[in-house]
Amino acid sequence: VRTDLGALFGSIDVYLFDQLLRGRIVPGMRVLDAGCGRGRNLAFLLREGYEVRALDPDPVAVEAARALARRLAPAIPESSFRRETVEDSTFPDACADVVISNAVLHFAPDEAIFLAMLRGTWRLLSPGGLLFCRLASSIGIEGLVRPLGGRRFSLPDGTDRFLVDEAYLVDLTAELGGRLLDPIKTTVVQGQRAMTTWVVRREG
């Protein structure tokens, strides 16, 4: 029997897929995508009956994610998909066992907003829950980025991003009261940009 993996998993981030393969995200968990876009990471979760919530400030993206849910998991209420920013989210505290933040935090214009976004993300996570973050970093391309001030950098690919590094993420993990589940891993894309995977368990 041939399985259409694309139809089954959608365009899920490969590092998020790794968390599924390792049994860290299992049916029955409440999953919130904090910056869902059009729902690229949600197709499998919706199809498999996870309790999914999602937010994004882009109304077109949120409507696309709602449409995906209507098709794959019609029992999920439309109110589970909200047009809002994570720092001002109306979802209740500790409402998710897994919070996904995939390519979101590096769009912060300064450190104050980055920290507000991160705290807003963390607030949604229940004790013992898993935070999955993918975000831009300077790791491995330190000599190729141009500082703009306040942890904002110009990258070789022509974009400007808020960049973290390993020491900053380690410090943030401790400040949040979390524990690294995996070593901090970074993919350098041909000297143009670096994307770091940061997976944290919320203690307590």
Can you say where each PLM-predicted feature lies in the sequence?
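A short SAM/SAH-binding and catalytic strip from SAM-dependent methyltransferases
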Residues: 98-112
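Flexible, active-site-proximal loop/turn residues at the rims of small-molecule/cofactor binding pockets
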Residues: 105, 117, 137
